[in-house]
């Protein structure tokens, strides 16, 4: 998903 998790698996 495109949210606060997009930095976890760049």
Swiss-Prot record:
Keyword Secreted: yes
Organism superkingdom: Eukaryota
UniProt subcellular location: Secreted
Gene Ontology MF: a single term: hormone activity
Disulfide bonds: none
Alphabetical GO biological process terms: neuropeptide signaling pathway
GO cellular component terms, semicolon-separated: extracellular region
The keyword Transferase belongs to this UniProt entry's keyword annotation: no
Phenylalanine amide modified-residue sites: 10
Keywords in alphabetical order: Amidation, Hormone, Neuropeptide, Secreted
Family note: Belongs to the NPY family.
Function (record text): Neuropeptide. Stimulates egg development in L.migratoria, but not in N.bullata. May be involved in the regulation of adult diapause.
Protein name: Neuropeptide NPF-1
Organism: Leptinotarsa decemlineata (Colorado potato beetle)
């Amino acid at each position: 998903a495109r949210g606060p998790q997009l930095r976890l698996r760049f």
